């Protein structure tokens, strides 16, 4: 949980939605950027266009990345990625994505934020960083196996895991929301009542929404 100053009625609905992300997706996206050591001027690739991937774009920009490459195939998510700070987008997958990103970045990105967890996404993430890059992996692994030869020969470091939420990122992200620097609440693209919670989960599973917002009461 993240303690917010004041009372709920002190804030707009949009601000409350942004606060809500600090206990989950925004903290996870920031964790990816932090463990990948994203620095001012860096080129960053973000694997994933869900709420965590979009939050990772916000985090990369917040940490000063100069170029941020999103990887979306969906117009609404690509547009939101651009609004959050993505400068480019690659819709291709697999070897085509690797080839395009390496060409765009003159040999690879400084950091790669893997926010999906599938074998294909992880494999791509290991191949699109420059030699010596860091992959920040926060996508929940769908497969226990991972090719370690590629990162070994490219001197690529891999770091990540569950976000801390209440340690190094808590005050930084809360201040960024309060100051209006970031607006991660935009990942909530549809509101549901508590009675509709099953529909809310299904809508995310069917990719009809980016993130469902369940409003318990008025």
Regions found by a protein language model. Give the residues of each.
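NAD(P)H dinucleotide-binding glycine-rich loop of Rossmann-like/cofactor-binding domains
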Residues: 1-47
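Hydrophobic/small residue at the entry helix of a nucleotide-binding pocket
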Residues: 28, 52, 77
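Glycine-rich helix-loop-beta junction characteristic of Rossmann-like nucleotide cofactor-binding loops
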Residues: 34-39, 104-106, 127
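Adenosine-nucleotide cofactor-binding segment
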Residues: 46-49, 61-124
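Residues in the short beta-alpha loop(s) of Rossmann-like NAD(P)-binding domains
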Residues: 73-74, 141, 164
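C-terminal hydrophobic helical "lid"/dimerization subdomain
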Residues: 107, 119, 123-127, 167-218
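ADP-ribose/adenylate-binding Rossmann-like module
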Residues: 129-144, 158-159
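Rossmann-fold NAD(P)-binding glycine/threonine-rich loop
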Residues: 139-154, 170-173
């Amino acid at each position: 949980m993240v303690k917010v100053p004041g009372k709920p009625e002190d804030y707009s609905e949009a601000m409350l939605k942004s606060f809500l992300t600090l206990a989950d997706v925004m903290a996870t996206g920031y964790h990816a950027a932090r463990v990948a050591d994203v620095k001012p001027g860096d080129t960053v690739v973000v694997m994933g266009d869900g709420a965590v991937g979009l939050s990772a774009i916000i985090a990369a920009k917040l940490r000063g990345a100069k170029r941020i490459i999103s990887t979306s195939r969906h117009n609404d998510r690509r547009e939101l990625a651009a609004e959050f700070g993505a400068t480019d987008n690659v819709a291709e997958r697999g070897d085509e994505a690797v080839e395009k990103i390496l060409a765009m970045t003159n040999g690879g990105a400084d950091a790669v934020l893997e926010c999906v967890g599938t074998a294909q996404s992880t494999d791509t993430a290991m191949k699109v960083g420059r030699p010596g890059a860091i992959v920040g992996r926060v996508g929940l692994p769908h497969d226990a196996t991972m090719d370690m030869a590629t990162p070994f020969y490219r001197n690529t470091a891999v770091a990540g895991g569950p976000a801390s939420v209440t340690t190094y990122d808590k005050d930084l992200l809360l201040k960024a929301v309060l100051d209006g620097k970031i607006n991660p609440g935009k990942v909530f693209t549809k509101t549901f009542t508590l009675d509709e919670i099953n529909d809310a989960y299904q809508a995310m599973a069917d990719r009809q929404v980016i993130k469902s917002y369940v409003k318990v009461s008025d």
